[in-house]
Amino acid sequence: MNKVLAEEDLPMRVDNLTTVWTVLFTRPGRYHWMFQYYLRAEGLALSWVGTGRCLFSLDFSEADYEKVKGALLRAARAMKADGWWDGNASASDISKIIGKEMAWQMVARRLAR
C-alpha cells in the first residue's frame, strides 16, 4: 500500500503493529484532519485523535484488507484532487500563516467594536 501511495505522490503512509494501523503524513499540512471525512465518504469511519489509527480484529480477512486499502487510496486520491495537499509549505511556514491569520482576526474584531 505504501508503495502505491508513494508512486501516486500522496503525502501519507500507513504503518502497522499487528492489528493497529496508523495513518502518517509525510509532508506538513494544515488540513490533514479533513482526511477522516474523505474516509467516511468512502465508507470507513475513523476516529481522529492526532494521527489516525485503525484497529482491526485478529480474524480480519484478505478481502477485508483490500476493502480498507481501497477506501484509503480512494480517499487520499480525492483529497489530493480537491487541492488540499497542494503546495510545499514547511511546518514553520504553516505556523506563520496561522499566526498571521489569528492576529488579523484579533485586530479585525477590535476594529469592529
Where are these regions (language model features)?
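Conserved PLP-binding catalytic core of the aspartate aminotransferase-like
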Residues: 2-38, 58, 101-109
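PLP-dependent enzyme catalytic core of the Aspartate aminotransferase-like
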Residues: 42-113
